[in-house]
């Protein structure tokens, strides 16, 4: 369906769907790493926020400070989520026409 001025909605919808599929594929392949406590807790996440690795320095476990360990795990996961969100914004912004990347 074409509108005055040559605007083709079907072509735009198809392009948007292709963009969405490309973005989903890139997010699936993306990996981000985050840490907390100076590297005591390390997390690796996929672009869809799935945690694929969580590593804890054994020395922190020996200290029996479970509350501190829990806080570091939460901090590492939150940092990973922040990095994924930043990467998504960056990738999406580079895929959109000039001027539209700032919408997100």
Protein language model features and the residues they cover:
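Residue-level signature of catalytic and energy-coupling elements of molecular machines
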Residues: 16, 49, 73
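N-terminal intrinsically disordered, cationic/polar leader segments
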Residues: 35-55
């Amino acid at each position: 369906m074409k509108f005055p001025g040559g605007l083709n909605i079907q072509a735009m919808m198809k392009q948007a769907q292709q963009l969405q599929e490309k973005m989903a594929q890139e997010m699936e392949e993306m990996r981000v790493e985050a840490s907390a406590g100076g590297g005591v807790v390390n997390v690796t996440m996929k672009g869809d926020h799935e945690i694929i690795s969580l590593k804890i320095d054994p020395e922190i476990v020996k200290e029996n400070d479970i509350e501190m360990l829990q806080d570091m795990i939460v901090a590492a996961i939150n940092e990973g989520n922040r990095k994924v969100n930043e990467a998504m914004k960056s990738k999406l912004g580079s895929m959109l026409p000039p001027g539209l990347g700032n919408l997100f």
